[in-house]
Structure formats: structure tokens, C-alpha cells
Amino acid sequence: MNMLSIQADSWFDGDAIHHQPVTVVIDAATITAVHNGRIAVPGSDSLHVGFLSPGLVESHAHLFLDGHEFDTAKRQAYMEAGREAFLATGRKNLERLRASGITLVRDCGDKWGINHALRTEAAGTALPVVRSAGVAVRRKGRYGSFFAEEVVDATTAAACVRTRTDSDDVKIVMTGIIDFAAAAVKGGPQFSFDELSAMTAAAKELGKPTVAHCSGREGIDIAVRAGIGSIEHGFFLDAELLERMATGGTAWTPTWIPVAWVRDNPAACAVGADGVAGLGRILDQHRANLIEAHRRGTVILAGSDAGSLGVRHGDGLHDDLAAYADAGLPMASILASATSAPRRAWGLAGGRIAVGQPADLAAFAASPLTGLGQLRRAVATVVGGRLWQAQSASRLAAA
């Protein structure tokens, strides 16, 4: 790509929203200048947009799953479709993510290695960068069969973790699914504190962040004490746990939308009146915990569990962000949860618009302050210095 200058009417730098125009200059995949106002940059191609941000991040997705299929029987049959079908779905999902302004996606597990394969395919292209957790780890006979390998004790669990040399994160299935009517997690934690500590220590030896599928106070308490890097889902948190997470640096990916979709579409999951009532209580508590997490400084990573029933890739992240807004989180914090916070949590460069930062950007027609829905469709993205433009985007002009 030639040197590119992007002129934006307003912008988010990764921490704060700016209401004044800016010109961002990109050369050799790096931001080389940030100028106040709209200026012509000799020798560059130029693009004018309404709003510029670091590229959005989907912190929890399953790329091989088709979130656009709502029929549960068809979804079950799809699980037997095989590798080529899974790859084809994943490729479409990456394009959907890009169209939604997402330039980095963390795939949180599949047992067929589709996430690793897509990571390789997307590398060096204008598609979103794939961060892959590979195959997760679960207790034998417990929840997680479609994305996790079974282990039987602390020794085999730690040994399993040590094989994850090609994974970007190590995912551990700490608890099961939720009983909607009871508004509680089904069953106890899959691993004890000692077992989980052995696994997090093994991951630390590899230099890999850890991710735990975890809900319920008992499981989250163990996960936080054992040093898990981020809690995925995290239903039934409380103020004391959120404070410990804030103090210890444990992040939280709330994945609001899958549960909200079931509440709003109970017939699709054969959920009765008791279940709907339970879902309401669960989501009320989740909303309160979002507010409490923000107040205490717990790191929030925006992630939707895209691919789950009712959660479309791309749209899912924006639905989650809308839930944060409905809960009362400030716009700058909402944007940070989907830009700078994940990259910082994972030790990655980027997530900020500043000189010397990687050119990893998303451009939109207008500011989200005029409506968060403005972020649902990008007019352009830049990944590794490679520009992609939506069909409706302004044409490049020689400056």
C-alpha cells in the first residue's frame, strides 16, 4: 500500500474521544504522523471518513460456528459437516467481522483446529488477525466436548497445557452451563484450586495467557486465586470478586448476547416461563455487575461468544457494546473494551492511534456519539498497513 493519509471528522485514540478533525498518516504498516485538523499530505493517497478508531476487537468467538443459523436441529446436524464446511464458514465469518470494523478476533476454541488454520490463512491479508486458543482443556465427561480435550487429573491437565505451544492463549473449561430456571450454574467446578494452579503454572512456563470458561462464585473464586488471565462469561459475579479481579488484573469478558437472545427467543430453545423469569434475573445481575466492574476498574473485554445460537459474527460484538451502553457505561470505556483493553491485556502492540503504533484501524461514516449503531458497518479498515474499503466507502484520491 502507498503512504495513506486518513482525514477524520472525529476520532477515538484508544483512551479518549476527540471531537476535532484529525489527519493520520500511515506508511509501511505504521502510524507515522497524527496531525490536528484536515491537512493534505503530499505523496499520499487520502481517505476522508466521519470517525476513526483503533480496529475493533472481538474477544470471544468461535469462527467455525454459524451464528446466522437459528434452527437448533440444523445447528446440531452441522456439527457433523466436517472440516471443509467448518473452514468455509470461518472464512465467511472473518469477512463479516471485517465489515463490522473488527480487525482482531480471539477464537476461544474448537477441537478440529479450524481456528489455527484460519489464523494461518488470514495472516498477511487485509482480513482480521486471528488470535487462536486452539483446543481447550476440560475435565473428562464434563461440558465442552466441541472445543476441548479431556483430562483426568492435575498431572494430565498440566501435561496437556504444556502441549499448547502453538496456541496464543490456553483455554480451560472451569464450569458447566447455566440452569436458566434455577438461575445457577449446573454442577460444581471442573477443577480444584490445586489442579487449576498446576495448569496456570504450566501456561506461564509457555508464556501463554490463560482464559477460563467460568460462571458461578465457586468456580470464579478458584479461577481468580489460581491466576487465570480472563474470565469468560462470568455470570453470577459479585462485588468482592470484581474487586479482587481489579486488584489482581484478571479481565472479564461478559458475553452478554447469548443469554439475552435465549431470553428474547425462548421457543427456539424450548425454554418455559420459569426459564424466562430466571434469564431475566441472570441478566439483571449481569447488568449490575457491568456497572460495578466499571466502577471498580475491573478490565472489561468486549466479546460476544459469536457463533453461539443467536449470535452473528460481527453483529454480536455490537450487540454486546449496546448492552454496555444500556447499562450506563461511558462511551470512551465502551470503545476501550473493544480496542485498547484487549490488546493491552494480551500484551499486543496497537489499540491506540499514536505515532509509532501499528496501523490497525477502523473507519466509520459517523461518530458513535450520534448513535452506537454507527459502528456496525465500517467504511474502511487497515490491518498491518493493508487497506480494505467497503463498497460504499469514498474512493481514494491522490493528495
Tell where the protein language model's regions lie, with residue ranges:
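Active-site gating loops and adjacent loop-to-helix segments of metal-dependent hydrolytic enzymes
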Residues: 62-88, 92-95, 134, 138-146, ...
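Short amphipathic alpha-helices and their capping/turn segments at secondary-structure boundaries
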Residues: 42-55, 115-124, 154-167, 237-251, ...
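Metal-associated gating/positioning segment near the N- to mid-region
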Residues: 50-121, 226
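C-terminal cap of metal-dependent C-N hydrolases
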Residues: 9, 336-340, 355-399
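N-terminal metal-binding scaffold of metallo-dependent hydrolase/deaminase domains
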Residues: 1-40, 51-52, 366-371, 386-387
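Histidine/acidic-residue-rich, glycine-tolerant segments that coordinate divalent metal ions
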Residues: 109-222, 230
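His/Asp/Glu-enriched, well-ordered alpha-helical/loop segment
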Residues: 205, 270, 284-367
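Active-site core of metal-dependent hydrolases
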Residues: 180-288, 296, 301, 306-308, ...
